[in-house]
Amino acid sequence: MFERFTDRARRVVVLAQEEARMLNHNYIGTEHILLGLIHEGEGVAAKSLESLGISLEGVRSQVEEIIGQGQQAPSGHIPFTPRAKKVLELSLREALQLGHNYIGTEHILLGLIREGEGVAAQVLVKLGAELTRVRQQVIQLLSGYQGKEAAEAGTGGRGGESGNPSTSLVLDQFGRNLTAAAMEGKLDPVIGREKEIERVMQVLSRRTKNNPVLIGEPGVGKTAVVEGLAQAIVHGEVPETLKDKQLYTLDLGSLVAGSRYRGDFEERLKKVLKEINTRGDIILFIDELHTLVGAGAAEGAIDAASILKPKLARGELQTIGATTLDEYRKYIEKDAALERRFQPVQVGEPTVEHTIEILKGLRDRYEAHHRVSITDSAMVAAATLADRYINDRFLPDKAIDLIDEAGARMRIRRMTAPPDLREFDEKIADARREKESAIDAQDFEKAAALRDKEKQLVAQRAEREKQWRSGDLDVVAEVDDEQIAEVLGNWTGIPVFKLTEEETTRLLRMEEELHKRIIGQEDAVKAVSKAIRRTRAGLKDPKRPSGSFIFAGPSGVGKTELSKALANFLFGDDDALIQIDMGEFHDRFTASRLFGAPPGYVGYEEGGQLTEKVRRKPFSVVLFDEIEKAHQEIYNSLLQVLEDGRLTDGQGRTVDFKNTVLIFTSNLGTSDISKAVGLGFSQGGSENNYERMKQKVHDELKKHFRPEFLNRIDDIIVFHQLTQDEIIQMVDLMIGRVSNQLKTKDMALELSDKAKALLAKRGFDPVLGARPLRRTIQREIEDQLSEKILFEEIGPGQLVTVDVEGWDGEGQGEDAKFTFSGGPKRAETAEPDLAGAGAAGAPTAGTE
């Protein structure tokens, strides 16, 4: 039975329990149910009794006079009396007789009257309300104007008190009176939108087809336009044709809810329309207008849109709709008969300046709610940062959300107790435990000392809490632009907070930081550093990516590694790099894997490898490795990314690349030169070799890529070949990694200069660059070290020194051997300058 109770009926039962507790009664009788019905205040029962002059205080005094108060407040569950149970059973019977499939407050009141012998009935009679008269009043309210059967409310149906309950019962159940809410000051102020509100008024004032539909993207303020109209009606700022109108918003969900049988939904909607037609002063607002299409339609039934069409065409029903562009196109435009009955009113996204004005108008509401002060700079930051960095939502909604969450964040921080209060709690708990242990051990002297210590700690804690509450809580917290930026950073992962002195210094020293992992390549490091500084200072073109580069040059000189180092510098993690191997996209049809498959193709729901990653990480470094191996169609798709900073994926969503750094690596034009030039250890002529290689690379790039692609790239950087000194520095980096691994085993590693030079000789190939160096170190150093550790020739606490035998520093040293000797570890072993960086970064620093 209770599953049929409406929310209000359930609330009546809860209130009846509360009334029983207040009177110290250990049961719930009919009198408590009557008190609950009146206390609920909004249902049909409460309105019926109120119209008969029955008040809560009057009933309560009569109950106390008849029964009196109990001696002791009951604890636990309070049971119903048999008579109260009978009333609830009778309420079900009354509902069925009226043809209702729910039990509301009106049915419970009718059950009380039908029972007729309980304390509740006696109280009503004493207060001058004859039971038959009460019943008639309930039936009259249920029947409305025409005296027909009650409008079904459906479980969870909404209602609210209004000035004339008998004439707006159905609308109150299925909607909300916006003009009443505006009169009570419950609606947020509407800033701007005068043109849209005026256009809505014009359409509403037409003779026929006077139904505007607000069309716009989600979050631009379509509902706010309707709320602005409601406020204009209340303030009398409307033409004569709209004065004294009541604006109701219709809840289609409550209309459909509980309509179990065919015809239930249509009957409810007809009653709503009949009430609107009878009153003649109602304007209906239907949010999410597209839900009308198909709403309530079942086998043999017609949907809500078909029921409304005749009235909309004749001007008998004034309706304001609101829906998004996509939903309007998908649902409304397909139904031409429905579309022509509505006049579209476009609601565009406000500008940043307009959004700031909107935020200023809403400031008081959010300050009162969060108990904070919101500065002007916070509102400017919310509008500008939201517009720039949140691209899948619209102003002013996203800016308002930033302000709201920043206020909530500040309030939560202020309401959280400081750490020293928790420390006091822990100390007090420890003192109590020690005191109890001392008492158990009958060490009463120690227990007395601990008791005094506990009292002292409690007093200190109370004083500290008083300081916190009187100091921190009395001062109104301030939400400024930094708070807004922090919230945005949490949302998007974009570090848009103000440049601190530490961050500024780090950016100015960016080249130095990158060179901890990248050996040489001054041109490339400078170009990338300038692009990042330009972005962080806010001077880059807001429509283009933060930077776009082609890294060209021989294999194994650090092109990919620089991309990883950049991602590590920005995010502290190499995994922040979005790396795409373009060798996987050499066929025409594989381009769909990158940007998302079109509808009807395999993988449509999964999205593209590039677009999905950038949507989730809008502030990232994107590396297109070996771009020359990709199909030509992919270059065409990337033109829009390079120029406008955006790309449409297979599902029609716009992906934003404005906060990404795009890096393309290429080996074009370097293979022949690498073979001819070799390592380039001789300093003389190395610059000429580089210029020849650079010219060759540029020529090859122009042959392979279209001019419109190369023209959109910020910079083409040709990497230098590595010199002997740079190769030795790379040895330091890689050996530093091995040394750090040995540190975990309490061992240290040291290489002689001759050993480093021999590793550089054996580990560098003029064609493959520095990549073979990793394999050389693995073969010559790591393999032998691992054997010696397993044979226990080297153990914890030792310093392993690596030297070379049989090589005088000349030639390739084919017969030379590396020697390993173990000795006591020094207190502070001097590590190579760059060893730490090698451990922090990728294992093969300086290589791709």
Swiss-Prot record:
Keywords: ATP-binding, Chaperone, Nucleotide-binding, Repeat
InterPro entries per record: AAA+_ATPase (IPR003593), ATPase_AAA_core (IPR003959), Clp_ATPase_C (IPR019489), Clp_N_dom_sf (IPR036628), Clp_R_dom (IPR004176), ClpA/B (IPR001270), ClpA/B_CS1 (IPR018368), ClpA/ClpB_AAA_lid (IPR041546)
Ranges for domain Clp R: 2-144
Record GO cellular component, one term: cytoplasm
Span list, region Disordered: 811-848
Molecular functions (GO terms): ATP binding; ATP hydrolysis activity
Positions of region (Repeat 2): 80-144
Residue ranges of domain UVR in the record: 425-460
Region feature Repeat 1, mapped onto this chain: 5-70
Disruption of the gene: reported phenotype: Depletion experiments (using anti-sense RNA) stops degradation of anti-sigma-E factor RseA.
Biased composition (Low complexity): 835-848
One of the GO BP terms on file: cellular response to heat
Record: residues binding ATP: 553-560, 617-626
One Pfam match: AAA
Membrane-crossing segments per the record: none
Summary of the function given for this chain in its UniProt record: ATP-dependent specificity component of the Clp protease. It directs the protease to specific substrates. Can perform chaperone functions in the absence of ClpP. Degrades anti-sigma-E factor RseA in the presence of ClpP2.
Family annotation (PANTHER family): ATP-DEPENDENT CLP PROTEASE, HEAT SHOCK PROTEIN 104
Sequence similarity: Belongs to the ClpA/ClpB family. ClpC subfamily.
Protein name per its UniProtKB record: ATP-dependent Clp protease ATP-binding subunit ClpC1
